[in-house]
Amino acid sequence: MAMRSGFLDRRPVLVGLVFLGGCLGTLIRSVIAHAWPSRADGVPWGTLAINLVGAFVLATLLELLVHAGPDRGVRRAVRLCIGTGLLGGFTTYSALTVEAGQRVMSGQWLWGIAYLLTSVAAGALLAWVVIAAVRCVMGKRSS
């Protein structure tokens, strides 16, 4: 006897949620990028901010979902729509590599490499801090 899955566990629905989230995330990123354009001679603050906000929100979301229970039903739908879709479309590591590469190709190789490494390291550190903070808060709530 096959297990009956809920509406939100159906693959086409999940793919659609990723697509919708991705469209919305890309739209939000585009609005921010146009409002805060990168300059060739300075730090691309818009891209850096987008990626750090994305790392913060994704780490928070995933850690909260881990504490909420198994990855199925609404939790899976939220993870895929917001985590994979929206934040996948919102963050822009392709712009990060293009901006770093442009600096390297223009002779500012140290600046380009430093920007790339700093961005990735800052995102990873931010995610680690957020995960630790959520675990601390969630641990206190379950006590």
Curated annotation (Swiss-Prot):
User: What does UniProt give as the signal peptide span?
Assistant: none
Write one Pfam family the protein is assigned to: CRCB
Where exactly are the transmembrane stretches of this chain? 13-33, 42-62, 80-100, 111-131
What does the activity regulation annotation say?
Na(+) is not transported, but it plays an essential structural role and its presence is essential for fluoride channel function.
- Reply yes or no: does the keyword Aminoacyl-tRNA synthetase apply: no
InterPro entries in alphabetical order: FluC
GO BP annotations listed: cellular detoxification of fluoride
What do the Gene Ontology cellular component annotations say?
plasma membrane
What name is this protein filed under? Fluoride-specific ion channel FluC 1
The set of disulfide-linked cysteines is none
Q: What does this protein do?
A: Fluoride-specific ion channel. Important for reducing fluoride concentration in the cell, thus reducing its toxicity.
Which reaction(s) does its UniProt entry say it catalyses? fluoride(in) = fluoride(out)
UniProt keyword Metal-binding, yes or no: yes
Which family would the database say this protein is a member of? Belongs to the fluoride channel Fluc/FEX (TC 1.A.43) family.
Keywords (alphabetical) are: Cell membrane, Ion channel, Ion transport, Membrane, Metal-binding, Sodium, Transmembrane, Transmembrane helix, Transport
| Positions that bind Na(+) | G88, T91
A GO MF label: fluoride channel activity
**Lipid bilayer topology:** Multi-pass membrane protein
**Location in the cell:** Cell membrane
Gene coding for it: fluC1
